[in-house]
Amino acid sequence: MGLLDSEPGSVLNAMSTAFNDTVEFYRWTWTIADKRVADWPLMQSPWPTISISTLYLLFVWLGPKWMKDREPFQMRLVLIIYNFGMVLLNLFIFRELFMGSYNAGYSYICQSVDYSNDVNEVRIAGALWWYFVSKGVEYLDTVFFILRKKNNQVSFLHVYHHCTMFTLWWIGIKWVAGGQAFFGAQMNSFIHVIMYSYYGLTAFGPWIQKYLWWKRYLTMLQLVQFHVTIGHTALSLYTDCPFPKWMHWALIAYAISFIFLFLNFYTRTYNEPKQSKTGKTATNGISSNGVNKSEKALENGKPQKNGKPKGE
């Protein structure tokens, strides 16, 4: 007998039971959360993170509509400051994770979570919290693209990467702010030092962009990172490492999704025949948030009014 043939009362009872079980599970998860981070900013509740991510998605949707009949913002100085600021932030995170894990004697093969208030463990948890915060700051990548009317840069890969990293890392900090979690964050923060250095240099304009021939290798570096993540996590599962299994499987699934998306980006960008200059499509994924030649020409020509309606 199918669900539609069931008595209304039994269907309601089943729905009520499922709802109550969900609520009980939610409450239980909070009993096993990391108590060290309970009072840290943004960690008391998931709603601030969800709200920020929702506002981000709304801006992705509404921002291009608002900018449609406006001149693009010229943001060279802002981009230079922002990108090199992100270099310093990621360098700080990498250093804290490296020094904290080294002093705590962490293993790169298998490391369980230590929820104690040991100075090195708290240092690692703090660095992971800053890593989570940095993913929220990275929402500005998209904001700058839209304000500069670079909407073709705001691809599915771009939005998926930014939105999921910030949201999912809240879960990571709330329950596993240490142990194996340090490895991926340490590797990713190091890669972001290189990436934002590239972005910062690109923001100086065309005179330096011709020397930045190594852009495609940033995408390759990202792909290597995802494969290393899968290999490292699979090894931990094989050795039955006492780290939450759900986190292991979530990391593998997440890395696989990025491999497919970045491979698609890499193939379209570097392996397919190049379009003509007039029809050239800007790249997504790790695309530069610097200043391109067309913006340089605008700056050297008639001054534009940032964000002003066209014709003013």
Swiss-Prot record:
The keyword RNA-binding does not apply. InterPro entries: ELO_CS, ELO_fam, ELOVL4. Disruption phenotype: Rod or cone-specific conditional knockout of Elovl4 results in a decrease in very long chain (C30-C34) polyunsaturated fatty acids in the retina, but has no effect on photoreceptors survival, phototransduction, synaptic transmission or visual behavior. It is a multi-pass membrane protein. Pfam families: ELO (PF01151). GO terms for biological process: fatty acid elongation, polyunsaturated fatty acid; fatty acid elongation, saturated fatty acid; long-chain fatty-acyl-CoA biosynthetic process; unsaturated fatty acid biosynthetic process; very long-chain fatty acid biosynthetic process. Residues 273-312 are annotated as: Disordered. It is an enzyme of class 2 (transferase). A motif (Di-lysine motif) lies at residues 308-312. Disulfide bonds: none annotated. Changing residue 161 to Q: Loss of fatty acid elongase activity. N-glycosylated. Keywords: Endoplasmic reticulum, Fatty acid biosynthesis, Fatty acid metabolism, Glycoprotein, Lipid biosynthesis, Lipid metabolism, Membrane, Transferase, Transmembrane, Transmembrane helix. Glycans are attached at residues 20, 292. GO terms for molecular function: fatty acid elongase activity. It comes from the Eukaryota. Expressed in the retina, exclusively in photoreceptor cells and in the brain, skin, testis and lens. It catalyses: a very-long-chain acyl-CoA + malonyl-CoA + H(+) = a very-long-chain 3-oxoacyl-CoA + CO2 + CoA; hexacosanoyl-CoA + malonyl-CoA + H(+) = 3-oxooctacosanyol-CoA + CO2 + CoA; octacosanoyl-CoA + malonyl-CoA + H(+) = 3-oxo-triacontanoyl-CoA + CO2 + CoA; triacontanoyl-CoA + malonyl-CoA + H(+) = 3-oxo-dotriacontanoyl-CoA + CO2 + CoA. Changing residue 22 to A: Loss of N-glycosylation. No effect on fatty acid elongase activity. Pathway: Lipid metabolism; fatty acid biosynthesis. The chain crosses the membrane at residues 42-62, 78-98, 127-147, 165-185, 188-208, 217-237, 246-266. Its EC number is 2.3.1.199. Belongs to the ELO family. ELOVL4 subfamily. Catalyzes the first and rate-limiting reaction of the four reactions that constitute the long-chain fatty acids elongation cycle. This endoplasmic reticulum-bound enzymatic process allows the addition of 2 carbons to the chain of long- and very long-chain fatty acids (VLCFAs) per cycle. Condensing enzyme that catalyzes the synthesis of very long chain saturated (VLC-SFA) and polyunsaturated (PUFA) fatty acids that are involved in multiple biological processes as precursors of membrane lipids and lipid mediators. May play a critical role in early brain and skin development. Oligomer. This is Very long chain fatty acid elongase 4. The lineage of its organism: Eukaryota, Metazoa, Chordata, Craniata, Vertebrata.
